[in-house]
């Protein structure tokens, strides 16, 4: 045996041991079962017999976080083309006929860090449904005529979104928050890229990311995990691994931190009601998972009707709605405040928001009871979210793509463990005196009256 062969064997053993140790402490809720196939495909089976249905979903670590300006929006286009044609059903008419035969409800979504596809049908159709999913994910057919039709559909989604002033404001804020890497936080894409998408570009995406070792298969519903694992292995077991982690092979560049506040005003004739939006670069699961938990708890506190933020803005008539949220991401999640201000009190609303933010880190900004109430809301929200079996696969696949299965399992318990010190660390690290982007969208007529530039500016 040569030294090169010995080194290769040693590397393979080390990799195997690392994989085994990575999953040795895997935690899942009761009724959830996990298995990794030899090709790297992870399979989660969720036994839930509330109704005689099964939902199958496959999630891929793909989405806008993998896209540069040449491919922006094409993960979304790829998702649409998934439902067109494949080796077993070579036309969309045949594909759709098969969904009707299965009695399937189906859809897909594309986000920052996940693309997922799912079908729900009678439990008796599980074997046939998994074969149908297998054909679509592994053996797609991309025809120019199909793509020409779907370009219009995908771009139509974009154009409809642009008719919403809230989308217009969000789009401009995001461009400024993420700078040169905006495309990696822009799942909807770029018009020109969508309208010139080709089969060749679809195959580039497929050959980069659509491998079993970059995917999670979830089988949920009135099923038994042992037989479901057997079906998964029989149907997906010969799907060839890429041989390496695609996310490591095609590294994701880090986002550049904001260096100063960026405040802008956007006039739009469709903005019948003005909106304000503010965004910070928040925590990343990969580097600060604890703060992703604290972020959700704090956001819930300040959206309580009893919170100082709501009382200062909504109860005092400065705004009709104030929402605060953080989106968990592996690669830098956004922290957002969205406000529907009183058109007659825009200056006062903006000034009071800044005043409230400056006080967020004061020990008396929220009470122990409000902290307890926020944790209770998060617990109840989790219970309600898990009432519908067909929604469970999307919940766990989102976490698998952006965090981990353990994070999903522990999430609700971890909310209950959040302390004031955890929240203070989150606020100090990401919000208090940290640069942000702020935007106001307003109609030209209203702006003539209020002269927003005289007060809506960096301070």
Range-by-range predicted roles:
Residues 9-12, 22-45, 224-268, 274-275, ...:
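Proteolytic maturation boundary segments
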